[in-house]
A protein has these predicted regions:
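Flexible, charged surface loops at secondary-structure boundaries
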Residues: 6-10, 57-63
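Active-site-proximal helix-loop-helix substrate-binding element of RNase H-like nuclease domains
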Residues: 31-34, 38, 42-51, 59, ...
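A generic local structural motif
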Residues: 1-2, 51-57
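Conserved "right-hand" nucleotidyltransferase catalytic core of DNA-directed polymerases
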Residues: 1-19, 28-30, 35, 129-286
Length: 286
């Protein structure tokens, strides 16, 4: 039912995967595109593109549903191409989280496919392509290009199969929900991931001079604040809150009889407990 509704709503339904260089995890770099592979699911047409630039996406934004596993990656690459983001996204990673969050240990493409018995390349081979072929090189010969495109296509095909399996499971889990409702929820989730990628790509302007001043002076500011506060409530020692001193403060305020304790009998010092008593005790509120 969902597939039929999607086919009615969109002229094109496209599974898309990209490969790119860049250290987004640690250095926050923008994607350096290597390739993109698209498969239009209605016709089976496959489009491959290799290179850092792309003049236009192969299918029009207002008529196409783009399917990706972790939309943020494809959205980042799209922006790195200098293109406007597509309007409609279906994120198979997010849909897997909706179905299985808290039930499974991973939501990566290979893990998702394994649960549905979808054939994929091995995790070891995937690591080989990423860490030994794609990331270490800035240029690629024809043989390397062909291997990378084939690898990218294998992910596209795997995600296509995952998409179909997800539709089947969603229809079972949400059997009382209308297809349009399910689709709208999925599109909203996909759009939110694309929007997040846009924020990350554009960055947030920072007053680096002011930030540096704050970072340089913060230790001294913190020390002064702690000293001033400690003169009033006496719970710190060398800048660190001490349990014995905290206990005495609670005792001074006649709260020992009502203060919650841990399983070991210690006074609780979690944020929720502190907030609760801060409403009626000035020392705690400080």
């Amino acid at each position: 039912m969902i597939w039929e509704q999607l086919c009615n709503d969109f002229k094109y339904i496209v599974a898309w995967d990209t490969e790119f260089r860049g250290d987004m995890k640690d250095a926050g770099e923008l994607n350096d595109p290597v390739c993109s592979v698209f498969k239009e699911l209605k016709s089976g047409t496959v489009t491959k593109h290799f290179g850092k630039t792309l003049d236009a996406l192969p299918y029009p934004s207002n008529e196409t549903l783009y399917i990706a596993h972790h939309v943020g990656a494809e959205a980042h690459t799209c922006l790195s191409y200098g293109l406007k983001l597509p309007k409609y996204w279906w994120d198979t990673l997010e849909e897997d989280k909706k179905l299985n969050f808290g039930k499974v240990t991973g939501h990566g493409l290979l893990a998702c496919c394994k649960r549905y018995n979808i054939q994929t390349i091995s995790a070891e081979l995937k690591k080989h392509f990423i860490h030994e072929l794609i990331l270490p090189n800035e240029t690629y010969n024809d043989e390397q290009k062909s291997k990378i495109l084939d690898y990218c296509l294998s992910d596209v095909i795997a995600n296509e199969e995952l998409f179909y399996k997800q539709l089947e499971e969603i229809e079972k889990v949400k059997k009382y929900d209308a297809p349009k409702t399910i689709i709208h929820q999925a599109l909203f989730a996909g759009a939110s991931k694309a929007a997040t990628a846009k924020v990350e790509f554009d960055g947030i302007p920072i007053n680096t001079e002011l930030l540096s001043t704050i970072q340089t002076n913060f230790p001294a500011i913190k020390e002064t604040m702690v000293e001033e506060l400690n003169a009033e409530i006496d719970v710190f020692e060398n800048g660190v809150m001490k349990y014995k001193k905290f206990y005495e403060m609670v005792k001074r305020n006649d709260l020992l009889s009502v203060w919650p304790v841990t399983a070991t009998g210690q006074l609780k010092t979690d944020e929720k407990t502190i907030f609760q008593f801060a409403q009626n005790c000035d020392d705690i509120n400080k």
